[in-house]
Structure formats: C-alpha cells, structure tokens
Amino acid sequence: IETIETIFEKRDQAENWFKFCHTFLMPYTTSIISNPAYTGADEVVAGDFIRQQFAYNWAGFYIGDGLQMTADPYGNIWRKDAAYNAIRYCNTFLEKIGGVYNMEEQEKVLWIAEIKALKAHYYFELLRRYGPIILVPKNVATNAGIGEMKQPRAPFDTCVEEIVTLLDEAMKDLPPMNQKSVSRRA
C-alpha cells in the first residue's frame, strides 16, 4: 500500500510528486480559455458565436462582458481542486523530501528551491485575483478541528512579503537560466 511516507522513500516516486506540483500551474497561466488575464478586458470582445461553438468556459469573455458572479466566479482558482490544493502538495513535498534516501543532497536543494518558487507563484496568482489571501506555511492536518482549519486572510503586505521571502530563498539555490539543462528550463 502506497502512502505519503513510502512515496518519499525513493527518488523516482518523489520526482512524480515533484512533477505533479507543477501540473496545477498550466491552466492558470498559459490557457487563453481559463486565464482571464488574456481575454477579460474590454479590449477583447466575443459574441455568442464563440460561446456556442466551443464547449469551453471562456472565463475572460464573460468577465469582460460584465458577467462575473460572486457565488461561482469565472476563472476561480480558490476552489478546492485548484491553487490551495497545489500549495498543499508543495507543502507536503517540502516536508517529506528529506526522507528520500537515493537522491543527492544537491538535487534535493534544487528541487526544494523550485517548489518554493512554484509555491510563491501560486500565492501570487491568488493575491492577484483576490487581494489578501490565506497563507499556508505548513499543511493543516486533515483531522484538525474547525477552529484550526478556519484561517484568516493575511494583510496584503504580509502576503507580498511571504511571496518575496519564498522567492529570495529559492533564488539563492537556483542556477541561472543559461546554466540549466534544457529539460529544467521554465
């Protein structure tokens, strides 16, 4: 039976977790359909033809047309399977990577730095879309009480400081772009 502890025993399994932490990133940043930053302004317009021809939820078009909703917002990354889930995976990685026995320390340091930068990006995306957010430096236990699970939003400046801190910590261990192998370039 595979558990989080057994996943973080061997490098190959830890690498799968490492890669999975990155999978949440693509829909938020690169998708013209789900990232409202591309099409959510008044400069881009679309008629019903676009909406009816494609089964996709063109979040930006709806926002640009003034149809954003509070109950079920377009481009929502606060939902349970999005950014905070990604942050939880990143936190788990940061907590458990030290237990991998067949991995060089230098590679662990590199992966930790990349995950910190990734976590900072998830925080940035949340902050950009929602203003002050809930910061999660460590995972809350799944069996924690409601009082422990209810966390307040941090002030805006604190959120920015946390993002900068994570990036500063990551930067000192990440090689410059021209020194990375092609497969490691973002």
Predicted features by range, described:
Residues 1-114, 118, 122-161, 176-178:
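Short acidic-aromatic linear motifs embedded in glycine-rich loops, typified by GG[WY][YF]DAGD(H)
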Residues 171-172:
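Amphipathic alpha-helical segments of tetratricopeptide repeats
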Residues 181-186:
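Aromatic-lined, polymer-binding surfaces characteristic
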